[in-house]
């Protein structure tokens, strides 16, 4: 590697809003605050909600269907 052309690689702390603290290294040079992490994200915790769009689809089909044509 060439000397003097690479950014400084510093140790930083990444803090999530849930309180999880992760120590890592980065060229950012400053600590980072996150909104969600792997410990509190709904997909990873199993608390994911499924949004039911069945009513919207039926309303769309009812509104834009051609009268007289039925599949």
From Swiss-Prot:
GO cellular component, one term: ribonucleoprotein complex
SUPFAM superfamilies xrefs: L28p-like
Ligand binding (Zn(2+)): 16, 18, 37, 40
UniProt keyword rRNA-binding, yes or no: yes
CC cofactor note: Binds 1 zinc ion per subunit.
Disulfide bridges in this chain: none
Example GO biological process: translation
Molecular function terms, GO-annotated: metal ion binding; rRNA binding; structural constituent of ribosome
Cofactor(s) needed by this chain: Zn(2+)
Source domain of life: Bacteria
Keywords: Metal-binding, Ribonucleoprotein, Ribosomal protein, RNA-binding, rRNA-binding, Zinc
Pfam families hit by this protein: Ribosomal_L31
Biological role stated in the UniProt entry: Binds the 23S rRNA.
HAMAP family in the record: Ribosomal_bL31_1 (MF_00501)
Subunit structure: Part of the 50S ribosomal subunit.
Family designation: Belongs to the bacterial ribosomal protein bL31 family. Type A subfamily.
The name this protein goes by in its record: Large ribosomal subunit protein bL31
């Amino acid at each position: 590697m060439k000397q003097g052309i690479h950014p400084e690689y510093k140790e930083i702390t990444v803090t999530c809003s849930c309180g999880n603290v992760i120590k890592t290294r980065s060229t950012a040079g400053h600590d980072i605050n996150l909104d969600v992490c792997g410990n509190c994200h709904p997909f990873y915790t199993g608390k994911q909600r499924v949004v039911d769009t069945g009513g919207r689809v039926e309303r769309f089909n009812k509104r834009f269907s051609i009268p007289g044509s039925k599949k």
